[in-house]
C-alpha cells in the first residue's frame, strides 16, 4: 500500500463505522441499512469501476465489499459468523495464500491483484488506477489522479472542492449528509432500504 500511495500521491476515502470521509475530506453519516451503498464509482463515460459496501449483521465483520473492475465482480465478505472474509471473483471462491498476490487477467493483461495480509485484503488495479484496502470493518479507497472530478458515490467527486461535495446520483445537491448518503443506497429484494 505504501508503494501505491507514494506512486499516485493523492487523497483517499475511507469508510469506518457509520461514516465515510470523502476524498475532499468531508465526513458523511451513513443511513441504517443492510443494502449496498455506492462508495465510489467512475462516473465518466468510461465507467471503469464501481465500489459498493454493505452492513452484514456480523459483529466481528460488520461490512462486506463488492467491486466491479471493468465487468469483473470482486467480493470480500463473511460467509458465516466465524469464517473470516472470503474472496469471490465472478462468483467463484478464490483461496489466497498469505502475502502472495492473486492475479486476475483479462485478454492477457493483469486487471487486478488481491493480496491478503493477515485479516487485511488489498485489491489493486494498476491499469485502472484503483486501490482498495479492506478488513471487514474499514474500507480504504484510493484512485489515480486522472479520476479527479469524474467520480461519484459516497466518497464524493474528488475535485478538491469541499463546498459542492454532496451531489447525488441524479446531480441533485444535498445540504444534509444523511440524505446525500441515502441517495447512494442500492435497493434490492434482499435488503431493507432506509
What kind of region is each of these model predictions?
Residues 1-194:
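Extracellular/secreted glycoprotein ectodomains characterized by long, lumenal stretches
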